[in-house]
Amino acid sequence: LAQYYLNNKRQRTQINESIRNFFAPRKDINPTHTHMLLSALPIRSYWTTNYDRLIEKTFELRGVSCRAHFSDENLSISTDNAQIILHKMHGDVENPNSAIIAKEDYEKYDDTHEMMLAKFKGEMCSKTFLFLGYSFSDPNIHHILARIRKVFDKHAKQHYCIMKRVTKRENGKKTKDYEYKLIKQNHQILDFKNYGVNVILVDDYSEINDILSEIKRRVYMKNVFICGAYEDETVNKDKIAQLGTTLATWLVERGFKIFSG
């Protein structure tokens, strides 16, 4: 639709205004529970195709510094003082003129966002991604996944995607074209698997929060906080030091992360 408008008007002023008006930060729109769960995980690099500022607002509420990159030009801005790096692949609401929305924007993406794609490709090769609410309709992502598979073959990094299972009934009503949608989803799952993306099916989107909560629990159950104090000067400090060393060694050897204060 955006491309049809550009073909007719030959300028994107109205599109830019629509993006700015629709996605502008509002006091009555706050981060969801899913946003808060994601922000609580030990993840430093996030990728999104959304224009809005909800992710930035989430970290602001947590008192965590977040640096957003939305173009090759601002990708070089220092992130030394940022705890979180947010990559907005399709642009930002405050810079609507560079937003990826029309067909020609996607076609030129390899040239206009060369550095962004290079960084995304690098992280896809070195990190594990969890895709949430992503349809994989972006041809650029498919191209990257295909190239990674070609280079690494069966040794490529494994990634995960959560999708809603096609059911016979939706909201109490019979699902239209159920058989077609089921076959299509099964083919999608196999296709994603070929690209190293493992699909996790849920019956309801609310289950995503359950999955994220379990991930959070498993991540932090390996964290151990150690602290203590003693006032008795007769205590054998060498024994205490030895106990601390023995305990720390035992924990580290078993994969625990130690925090002290």
What does each model-identified segment do?
Residues 1-39, 44-47, 52-55, 59-63, ...:
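Gly/serine-rich nucleotide phosphate-binding loop at the start of the catalytic core
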Residues 12-17, 84-104, 109:
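A charged nuclease-like catalytic/ligand-binding cleft shared by nucleic-acid processing domains
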Residues 27, 33, 38-42, 62-67, ...:
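SIR2/sirtuin-family catalytic core signature
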Residues 37, 45, 49, 54, ...:
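Basic, glycine-enriched DNA-binding surface that flanks or lies within the catalytic cores of DNA
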Residues 58-60, 97-103, 141-145, 238-239:
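A short secondary-structure junction signal
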Residues 90-91, 163-166, 225-231:
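Short loop/turn segments at strand-loop or loop-helix junctions that form parts
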Residues 103-119, 144:
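Active-site glycine-rich loop that binds ribose-phosphate moieties when present
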Residues 220-261:
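Glycine-rich beta-alpha loop segments
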